[in-house]
Amino acid sequence: MLDRRSLLLGSLLLASSFAYADAAESGGMVTPMPTPDGGIQPQAAVDARGVVHLIYYKGDPKAGDLFYARMAPGESRFSAPLPVNSQPGSAIAMGTIRGGQIAIGADDRVHVAWNGSDKAEPKGPGGNPMLTTHLNAAGTAFEPQRNLITWAGGLDGGGTLAANHTGDVYVVWHANPDRDGEENRAVYLAHSADNGRTFGRERRINSVPTGVCGCCALRAFVDRAGDLFVFYRAATAKISRDMYLLASSDRGATFRSEKVHPWNINACPMSSSSLTQTDTAVQAAWETQEQVYFADFRPDGGRRTGPIAAPSGGSGARKHPVVVANGKGQTLLAWTEGTGWSRGGALAWQVYGPDGKAVTALRGRQPGVPVWGLLTAFAHPDGGFTLLY
């Protein structure tokens, strides 16, 4: 069996395969790219210096590994990958919505959180752990993974994390310690005030008893003003699977709750969502009834514009939306089509102008999303977008 050092040394040989063309050089505003190294479920974040940080998944969908690579401004290649999880096989890709999440904290420290697989250690109360780690100060390796669940166990759908430049790191998951149905699930937060070195005990943050869709993922985000947002799908009475946005202006001490979009369905859609920063607002993207939408929100969580639906056309149910804005006020909305349990599909996208209207010429679709695949995207200084699948 290869140890972690062998994996790292071997990964150096793969660096030459991580080439990426600049969006402006690719002949189009949106450049679709497969995840490097044959990985799936890419997740990207861009730091204050313009460095793109990427994590992705490889291995057995039930018990695999996360890897990390970065690309500096002006470069066209991602670095050789580093292993993220310290215990091999402790991540999970099956179901699509339980994989790794990435955030950039103080001093551009990279933080990662993920739902632990059945093999993952240390275990938490109620089973699978909610795991986290961060890149060391030298940027050469990740610290040993830690479980943050101390009492709110019963993990199911994907957890998430967010961070800011002042040292706050927020890891969020939904759980049901009493195991009495998803209509009684709640959202829990573990907060670090020292850039991920230590975390406080988790506490419930949604005061409205909405329940939480058991096998749906959460998404957290900190805007440039330091406000914290958490986007989740409810499961009220097992039927009302509406999207809710929680917003906090006091570093997660208190939250306001805003119902964003209704959806009555007596089933779990296994959905994910997206949050991003624009020049003037926070944008959210989500799925409702096999369609994807996005909207702008104020710091208090109230909606400013939208929801705006993706244009008609395509083939298959639309899922797993991603939204990202560039410096010109344009928005890229991307999503998968035809994906499902143990089934890949296509990726599709639409660029919207600063007025919120779809630019017909900046629309696309192509096959290639692998089984258990997700999308991620980032904007370039020239306004172009790279869309990873």
Which residue ranges define each predicted feature?
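Short alpha-helical segments used as structural interaction elements across diverse proteins
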Residues: 1-2, 230
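N-terminal export leaders
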Residues: 3-8
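Hydrophobic h-region of N-terminal signal peptides that target proteins for export
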Residues: 12-21
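Extracellular, repeat-based ectodomains that mediate carbohydrate processing or recognition
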Residues: 21-389
